[in-house]
Amino acid sequence: MATAASTSAAAVAAASRLLVRRAPPRLLRRLPRAALAASRPSPPSSSSYGAAAVALGRQPLGHRARMGHTAAAAAAAGPALGLTKPNAVEPPQVSFAAKDVEFSEWKGDILAIAVTENDLVKGSDSKFENAVLKKLDGQLGGLLSEASAEEDFTGKAGQSVVLRLPGQGFKRVGLIGLGQNAPSTTTACKGIGESVASVAKSAQASSAAIVFASVGGIQEDFKLTAAAAIASGTVLGLHEDSRYKSESKKVHLKQVDLIGFGSGPEVDQKLKYANDLSSGVIFGKELVNSPANVLTPAVLAEEASNIASTYSDVFTATILDVEKCKELKMGSYLGVAAASANPPHFIHLCYKPPGGNAKRKLAIVGKGLTFDSGGYNIKTGPGCSIELMKFDMGGSAAVFGAAKALGQIKPPGVEVHFIVAACENMISGTGMRPGDIVTASNGKTIEVNNTDAEGRLTLADALVYACNQGVDKIIDLATLTGACVVALGPSIAGIFTPSDELAKEVAAASEISGEKFWRMPLEESYWESMKSGVADMVNTGGRQGGSITAALFLKQFVDEKVQWMHIDMAGPVWNDKKRAATGFGVSTLVEWVLKNSS
């Protein structure tokens, strides 16, 4: 991801050879040949694509034979740095059911009641005026009104309290504040689900029910969406990524009943959808949370292959190694990958619907930098956040999270290609240098004036590859620019597209997902700053309008006949307060695919 803190550090390449140059001859005679070979400069070349041939002791055959690493280099990589391995922690497994029962007769661990501030209004007799609360309070002998007053519960949004009330069919009552009004958005309903998870965790409950005090508070045409959002919010609220902690917390909640949302196949299908979607979001979050010494490009490819194996009735996986990427002339992608000891993996999952009758073909492309050091324009200085650059594969996490969810949902009538050019952007003697020129697979040449603007270089070849699949529409997602975070803040992703139709589709999908997007301009006049004197283009323009020029760069690698959208998600990929990934993008992508299915 390009950041303002990037700076050139060309002298780093020579540092590894300094000791050997100064060592006395007697010491040089004692050094093993491998150490001496590593200390010598690589043979001169017109490119910076890597030196697999040199590493194997052979003379180079020109830059096309030296673009990256080999399978032998991958095998020699050894175990994960620091011997870190994730613990086997199962994500929350919760069953949801919509029930038409009287809430006061429900039996289980905790009855969660969602209340507005107005629901808590009391009459002159100090009793609740709301029918649901009044009935429950009477059943409890006035304990509910007394306990809520003692806890100073006022029904404000986000407020919750758990009351122990023995002797009932339910062991506890949880009150969840909604604010002044009943929820009317997906985001608000997800928040209710998160509150259900919170009160259930505090009570270590294995079963829960959710009911609204204002029976008519949720609009009838919104109930199905609300039920799914509450279920999704509950699962995501229960999830805590403890794979890298010495102790993990157990999830007790196994059953949640939704009362007052109707019953039957339609609502049951919505609740299943919520569970399927949540599993994809959790998968995406866990990919981003994984450190770079564990989640290498090879491991990311393995995770993608596992999706294809698990849902083999609708998925196939193709993983391209370096040699195949050379054949496809992916010089832009391989240039970024050249410095890393971990070889790149180009990942292509293909979803074909049951029955194989697809009326539309879509592609979803994700940036897959499993770590971004910035390269020779190394990230340094305050605010560079180099320690967080494991999240530079957030676009690919959204892609594969959506793939996992869609493998379970199995939408008809649509074929979807999930494409990620996975690699690391590191620093070494084989690395891409500022000023190098790389050639993308569509033949366009790029002068690299900033090695920390690497994501767009990998996406260039990925977009060309996507267009070659004969797709109708492409969405790419990337943690691409700090400029977009400056413009839109940490919660909103920027979208760039010349297609009004595609913009409307994603806007409609985001209304259901609750994720926030803002359409940004593709100002063509800004392309002037992207022109090179020696190549077709440079990879970065000036500081002003950086997210726009980045999008204009990507546009050069998309066929004009294909509808295309770029999503810059550098802000919402990460939650600074929780110090964890958000799973952003998965829900909107799934909704978009469903809207394109028959």
Curated annotation (Swiss-Prot):
The keyword Plastid applies. It is found in: Plastid, Chloroplast. The active site is at K379, R456. Mn(2+) 2 binds at D372, D452, E454. Its main location: plastid. Mn(2+) 1 binds at K367, D372, D392, E454. It comes from the Eukaryota. It catalyses: Release of an N-terminal amino acid, Xaa-|-Yaa-, in which Xaa is preferably Leu, but may be other amino acids including Pro although not Arg or Lys, and Yaa may be Pro. Amino acid amides and methyl esters are also readily hydrolyzed, but rates on arylamides are exceedingly low; Release of N-terminal proline from a peptide. It holds the Pfam family Peptidase_M17_N. It is an enzyme of class 3 (hydrolase). One of its GO terms (molecular function) is metalloaminopeptidase activity. Binds 2 Mn(2+) ions per subunit. HAMAP family: Cytosol_peptidase_M17. Homohexamer (dimer of homotrimers). This is Leucine aminopeptidase 2, chloroplastic. It comes from Oryza sativa subsp. japonica.
